[in-house]
């Protein structure tokens, strides 16, 4: 036997390589690739495809977020369907210095500052509407009235309770002052701090309305006046003096000194009383005794008998338009803070205004009333109503001796002011403010394109830019010289205007098509109803004809006789008519008979 030399197992011959290559090509031709048999290769391909898919999803998510952030800076124009950039809010600059300072404050960034609603919520949580100040103010007069009938040994306990109440009031005032300081530290309310200082510097004129509606609890004789008027009535002053003597005899010297020192204590909100009740409070004597009942009754009679005139009201800051010009905001809200808000209808200014000028008709709005106030004819119409004529029997008494000396001077000033102009309502300001408001109202009616064209000083109106034909528009543009911003704005206005006109025409055509389709549908409904009526009428006619035919059939059949003269039975025979009009009697179970009628 011949020994064949085999190649080493690690080496492959050229024939083997060719055979493997042929078999590989055959597998490829049959659609079988290497991945079918190689599991690791299939795993790699699967991982690669998975990574590509995740990367694609990540890119899509990023693109969606970018589109969302991009469209958040634009707003959709409902007329043209375009996305327009959102214009930032512009602060309107007015002529008054107060508004300039307020606009400067408004430009301060507010990331760390509190908002106005948060401040009001903090104020409401800290101090509720029914606070302890009112309850203490109600409790103190009751103790003061009951102290007349207490024994001397109880005066010390009463004095201690009053001192505790005063300490509570002082602590509440300190807390209120701290809260107001925190509110004034907010950038939004910086303008209110300066205005509050200006109001604190000016001396307030005593207002009869404030005196009649509000009493300070620290002044002892206010509550005693009302109680004495109710109980004593029209008794003489000697009874009151006797009452005071008996009261002073009850108390010991120590208690009386403590009580008089308590009444004449200068720390019990004397600024508040001196500011608002200086015309009605008698100056305390050097001895520190209580005011006499004669002075009290005299001041009360002067208060009740005195009449309120328009010139007296004009001296008050709330009714004088000159004082109202100094402040930009209306100090009218219940919380003491107001930012460019109109006065409420429940405020005292409106009540006095309605009593002096008369209530406006119910059909008028606020804007119409402002236009009437600014019109020159309104002064002549409202002039006679501003100063009501007094009857000859009326007696005008001055509120105080100092005011009594200056009464003729104030009357002449009041007449001069009524001849010149009627004071405007407390909430509204004079003619310059209304003019600015009127111009801002006119600017509010302008469109966005008109405002931009006005800002860039474009000499053509927006309607002309949009509606002119192409040749006329090019000729108009060639006559003027424009910069890049003006040209871009004019082209943008014309493009969007044409798009708007095209959209309007498209909507018009759609509406016309809808109306035409509605008309066609209405015609079809009418025709359908007409056909239904005709069908019903035809059915009724057919039913009538069938009934008449059956009646005629029975009549003819009853007239037929056989050879014996007997009538034919309807169950055995029937009548049939041919096309030529002949009628035959045909038996039902047999062939047609030859008898002819």
Swiss-Prot record:
Residues 333-345, 571-580 have a biased composition (Polar residues). Disruption phenotype: Mice are viable and fertile but have low and uninducible phase 2 detoxifying enzymes, are much more susceptible to carcinogens and the toxicity of oxygen and electrophiles and cannot be protected by inducers. Mutant mice show an increased mortality during LPS and cecal ligation and puncture-induced septic shock compared to wild-types. They show greater pulmonary inflammation and greater TNF secretion upon LPS administration. Mice lacking both Nfe2l2/Nrf2 and Keap1 reverse the hyperkeratosis phenotype observed in Keap1 knockout: mice and are healthy and viable in normal conditions. Glycans are attached at residues 454, 464, 479, 491, 561, 566. Widely expressed. Highest expression in liver, skeletal muscle, luminal cells of the stomach and intestine, lining of the bronchi and alveoli, and in renal tubules; followed by heart, spleen, testis and brain. Residues 514-521 are annotated as: Leucine-zipper. Pfam families: bZIP_Maf. Keywords: Acetylation, Activator, Cytoplasm, DNA-binding, Glycation, Glycoprotein, Nucleus, Phosphoprotein, Transcription, Transcription regulation, Ubl conjugation. A motif (DLG motif) lies at residues 29-31. A motif (ETGE motif) lies at residues 79-82. Transcription factor that plays a key role in the response to oxidative stress: binds to antioxidant response (ARE) elements present in the promoter region of many cytoprotective genes, such as phase 2 detoxifying enzymes, and promotes their expression, thereby neutralizing reactive electrophiles. In normal conditions, ubiquitinated and degraded in the cytoplasm by the BCR(KEAP1) complex. This is Nuclear factor erythroid 2-related factor 2. It comes from Mus musculus. The gene is Nfe2l2.
